[in-house]
A protein has these predicted regions:
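N-terminal organellar transit peptides
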Residues: 1-87, 91-112
Length: 112
């Protein structure tokens, strides 16, 4: 992958695959780049494959909102770990799937 994400349109099906397999927002690629590429998807469905320890909260929130508000059907698939902001992105799916051996980590909430 050239970035922390990869988008593959699939000519044989109606589902595009999006892979978030690294630190969210790393390598000088921000949410705007991700969202700009997300807009190019022509398929009816989007599968977001996640294996990430997290990353930039602000980029992650923008990605969550873009996926949650997308007109396509979004399925998020935790394939290894969705930790920190990656767990928030995972919650953007219309359908959320996890393998039995996958991990989903959220931070301890705090309130005043």
């Amino acid at each position: 992958m050239k970035n922390w994400f990869e988008i593959q349109n699939n000519a044989e099906s109606e589902t595009a695959d999006v892979y978030i397999y690294s630190e969210v927002g790393g390598h000088d690629v921000n949410a705007k780049t991700f969202i700009d590429e997300l807009k190019t998807i022509k398929d009816k469905n989007i599968d977001v494959h996640i294996n990430s320890l997290g990353g930039s909260v602000f980029d992650g929130l923008a990605i969550y909102n873009a996926l949650k508000n997308h007109s396509k059907k979004v399925t998020t698939k935790v394939e290894g770990i969705a930790a920190s902001i990656a767990s928030v992105i995972a919650m953007a799916g219309d359908k959320i799937e996890m393998a039995e051996n996958s991990l989903f980590m959220i931070h301890n909430p705090f309130a005043s």
